[in-house]
Structure formats: C-alpha cells, structure tokens
C-alpha cells in the first residue's frame, strides 16, 4: 500500500495540511478561502471523478444560478425544506451580499433575472468555474482527480485517509464537501468514522405520469398552476411544464423538495390534483362560467378560451370533459360544465415514479446538523473535522438556494479551519 503522508517544513516548522473531500462548489470555496486567509496552510482538494465543479457547469442550463436575489435572512430560510434554522445562524456569517461581493472582487459581475435568480452577466457557468480555478491556482491549492475517499480515521491527533485502494494520506484538517448521496450505503465511510448521518432521499425531481394522456401536450407551459398531493397537505404554486414523461417545472420541483420524505415513503406513487386556474376555486369559476355563457353565447367554446390557458391545454380539458368542438357557450350542458370546471380546478393525475432533474438534483439528508457547530462548521464530536455544502442535512428548492448554502458553509468552514491552525 502506498503511503502519502508528507509534512512540509518551513523555517524549521511543519506546515499544516487541509484536505477537502469534493471538488464541487462548497469544496472549492472552502479550499480557496482557507488557502487565501492562511498562506502557510497546505490545501489539497480530492475529487473522486475526472470532472471538477460538475453542478456548477450544468446549473441553470449551463449558465450557473450562483445565488438568489433575496437579502432578508428571514425570507431566505423559507426556501430550505430542511436546514432553515441552521442556515438562519450561518447566513449571519456569509450571506447573499457577501457572495455578490466576493465574485465582484474577482471580476465576476452577477445579474438578477425577473424571478430573482442570479447569474454571471456572461450567461456562462464557465465564468464561475474559471474564477474558482484561478483562485485555486493563485493560492497554491493542489487538485487531485480520481481520488475517492474509502476510509477516514483519527490517528495520533491527525486524520488518516485511505484513498482508492492503495493510497494513504494524513492531514491535520479534513473538510467533507462531497455532496449528497442518494443511498445510505454510499455514506458508509462516513458512518464508519462515527459520524451520524440522516437517511438520504432524493429531492428536486420531476413526476412520471406513464399512463396519462396529458403527456400528449409535451412542451406546453402554464405560467401559474397549483398542484396538491392528494391525501396530503403538500401544495405548491408556480410555473408547470408538461413533458413527454409527465410533469416538471418550478412548481413540481418545489413540491418534490418539500415532500421529499413523504413522497419517498409512498415509493413515489401518489395522485396529484392540478388547478390550472389557481385564482379560482370551483364555486368562483362556476360564477364566471355563467357570465361567459351570456358574454360569449354564440361563440364556440373550443375557439374561445377566456382564461388565458394555452390553447392545446384548453382543447385537452374540453375533450376530457366531453365537450364537443362545435358546442357554443350558450349550449353548454350543466353536466359538461360541471365536469369542465372540475377539470380546470382539480384535474387528477396518477404519479408513478420520478425522473431526476439533472441540473439541480439534490438529496434530502446527510450529516446530522446536531453534530455540527454552525459558527465554524466543525464536528462537535471530532476536532478538526469540518463539513460544507450538500454533505450536510440541508437542501433548498430550485433557484440558486443550494449554491448559497455551498458558498456560506464553505466560507464558514474555511474560517473555522484557519482559526485552528
């Protein structure tokens, strides 16, 4: 077995070492800031794959949704289904304004879009990647690819790490920034080290509707819909996209995040009720229908869509309600009207399975927050063991919130490590 346990001697003193596990956003942010604040610290990033900053690269359709233009901590923490109370304290150390300022200082300007998401003005994730790689190079951060941590143990006041099958490294400090794993078994090396882990389940996924004819509307987007999980309190509102496999869009992703554990317990098989006109309930929509019967009496219902719904969706709802294409508003039978109102306000669809939303797929679960000091990101149980990013039991909805968690916890971990050097 190859043993790599070098100690660098400077002016008669040994240079302390930090090993960061994970070459993602949180890992890089911890590494480059620790190296910048403490030049005498040897910093090494170990990435188990051959690619660095993978989520940064694909986030936001390749533009990188760096953060969200929310400047109130009280409002920000509402975007995290798990870990909001923890982040309420963490955000006092490093928040949205700090993220914007940090990147601006390094020549990266961010812009805000109408929905609050923030991107580099270049509209390219490569801008963020280049910035982080440049910082790593500037401060001498070593990057080692295809290095998977297999075992972590404390030995003689330092950490011993078994990498791949035949390499041993030692370090004074370790920061776990390995991201989330979808299966508990993948946390084995962490659990074996005595770290308590909350059972992981997927979050931010889309819904499969394999037997639903609504899939024929692939590509149709509704600007605002309300979706409720039947038999549950889970309800969200927002843009909805119909896909060839089912439903996606911000409203579905938010629902999957807030319902991550409940939906996993149902094995991702459940029914949803979609209100395509969330400003109305069945009673108020019935009143509006009566009004339209007079206003549009001579016009064909199929040709006159008074609700602003996409035409393909409107025609689909008419078909599902048994309304003929040539039927006029004045001639709409009461039974057909009631069915159409029901389908507009509470269309029911059977969900059977999920599909990963690759751009922002996260997991609910990870290192239990009760075992982490929020002011340093250090383990309460093991000195000089730190955490950052999605490795901990924090996850946000889509919109830049998971990256803000990465920047914040990476920053706090860097400061916490340096204070112990």
Where are these regions (language model features)?
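Glycine-rich FAD pyrophosphate-binding loop
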Residues: 35-61
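Short beta-strand to alpha-helix junction loop
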Residues: 87-95, 115-134, 181-185, 212, ...
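Residue-level recognition of phosphate/Mg2+-coordinating polar/acidic sites
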Residues: 37, 49-51, 72-74, 92, ...
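Short hydrophobic core segments
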Residues: 19-21, 149, 168-181, 190, ...
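A conserved FAD-binding loop/helix module that cradles the flavin
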Residues: 179-181, 185-188, 394-420
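Glycine-rich loop(s) and the adjacent beta-strand/alpha-helix scaffold that form part
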Residues: 173-215
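N-terminal Rossmann-like FAD-binding beta1-loop-alpha1 element of flavoenzymes
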Residues: 16-45, 413-417
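A conserved short coil-to-beta-strand element within the FAD-binding core of flavoproteins
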Residues: 145-158
